[in-house]
């Protein structure tokens, strides 16, 4: 490993791909993890039409494309599309030759083993990287917050999970994974906006709803009181201008949408809310370390960006925790990118340099090396 060659850090989320160089304090490229296929045949001669559009370009042309997300619930479901996204990341976004840089990738905890192996295989065989490493997202978020102990609630677009980390070690037996995240909230918002008479159905319209969700929603401190308040007056109403110039008004949808994180039964899911997941995670840990975990609940990921979520988490977890226990929720302002930032910190540490899986390691042992070298 040369010292002057920067490692590439790629955080492949279900919704957004964050990529950049180790040592930087923010990702250079952030683009949607979308592959768009044209719905119609191109007829204009001389237009350089492609067979696939990726990321922002797919987003811009979404009206004539069918959009696909290759990562669902944190797991890659379409490897051909995933290769397109990676190659777009290296060649178009970062403009680097992958064979010259070690690559750090991230993944959701409790992912299928085959998923990791396939990632490793593609990196070494398709992109010929000199070295690579796969790390669990939540652990990286904790690095970014400057802690070595804490319970991380990481909620992105496709998957949420709570991971307890003590003195830098993730405790795998206590990880709770929740397949409920930003995309489910967007779907739910599409549904409840339909009740208002606004119809959003296509993959392109879903992106509009995602934008409404990101700009206007918030978490209510007390859901029932907020519902009554919304019913009594229109003080909570906000308007949003659609791309065609029409203006729609949204009211209680603003806080009904993120409420799903705390009450998954609202969308017919039997799973527990995020506050209970964090509580279950802490309860699965040794009794001696629980206080440290309660005092360091770190939020990370885009679906923890809702205003009011920190206070609401504090309230809900204090209810569940033992009476004298102080619950402290940490909401770093850069938490949307904290997984990437943690990866950037890790890959630039001198002590990390002997951890990489090298091309030689891979040639000797094959894809299964990833389970031995990457914890």
Swiss-Prot record:
PROSITE patterns: ACTINS_1 (PS00406), ACTINS_2 (PS00432), ACTINS_ACT_LIKE (PS01132). Pfam families: Actin. It is found in: Cytoplasm, Cytoskeleton. GO terms for cellular component: cytoplasm; cytoskeleton. Its EC number is 3.6.4.-. Keywords: ATP-binding, Cytoplasm, Cytoskeleton, Hydrolase, Nucleotide-binding. It is an enzyme of class 3 (hydrolase). It comes from the Eukaryota. One of its GO terms (molecular function) is ATP binding. Its main location: cytoplasm. It catalyses: ATP + H2O = ADP + phosphate + H(+). Gene3D superfamilies: 3.30.420.40, Actin, Chain A, domain 4. Actins are highly conserved proteins that are involved in various types of cell motility and are ubiquitously expressed in all eukaryotic cells. Belongs to the actin family. This is Actin.
């Amino acid at each position: 490993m040369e010292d002057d060659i920067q490692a590439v850090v790629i955080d492949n989320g279900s919704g957004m791909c964050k990529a950049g160089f180790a040592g930087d304090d923010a990702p250079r490229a952030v683009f949607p993890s979308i592959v768009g296929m044209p719905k119609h045949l191109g007829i204009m001669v001389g237009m350089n039409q492609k067979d696939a559009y990726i990321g922002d370009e797919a987003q811009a042309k979404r009206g004539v494309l069918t959009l696909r997300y290759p990562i669902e619930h944190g797991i890659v479901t379409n490897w051909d599309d995933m290769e397109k996204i990676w190659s777009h990341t290296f060649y178009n976004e970062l403009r680097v030759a992958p064979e010259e840089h070690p690559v750090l990738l991230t993944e959701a905890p409790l992912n299928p083993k085959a998923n990791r192996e396939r990632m490793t295989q593609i990196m070494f065989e398709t992109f010929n990287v000199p070295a690579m490493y796969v790390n669990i997202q939540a652990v990286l978020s904790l690095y970014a917050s400057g802690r070595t102990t804490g319970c991380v609630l990481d909620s992105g677009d496709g998957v949420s999970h709570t991971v307890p980390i003590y003195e830098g070690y993730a405790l795998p037996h206590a990880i709770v994974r929740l397949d409920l995240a930003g995309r489910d909230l967007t779907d739910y918002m599409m549904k409840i906006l339909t009740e208002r008479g606004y119809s959003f159905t296509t993959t392109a319209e879903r992106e509009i709803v995602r934008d409404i969700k990101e700009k206007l929603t918030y978490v209510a401190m007390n859901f029932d009181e907020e519902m009554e308040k919304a019913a009594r007056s229109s003080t909570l109403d906000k308007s949003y201008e659609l791309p065609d110039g029409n203006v729609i008004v949204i009211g209680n949808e603003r806080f009904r949408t993120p409420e799903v994180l705390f009450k998954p039964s609202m969308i017919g899911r039997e799973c527990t809310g995020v506050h209970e997941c964090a509580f279950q995670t802490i309860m699965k840990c040794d009794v001696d370390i629980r206080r440290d975990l309660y005092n360091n609940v770190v939020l990370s990921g885009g679906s923890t960006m809702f205003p009011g979520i920190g206070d609401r988490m504090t309230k809900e977890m204090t209810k569940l925790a033992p009476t004298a226990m102080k619950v402290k929720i940490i909401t770093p302002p850069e938490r949307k990118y904290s997984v990437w930032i943690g990866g950037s910190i890790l890959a630039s540490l001198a002590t990390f340099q002997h951890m990489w899986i090298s091309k030689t390691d891979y040639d000797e042992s094959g894809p299964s090396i990833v389970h031995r070298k990457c914890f």
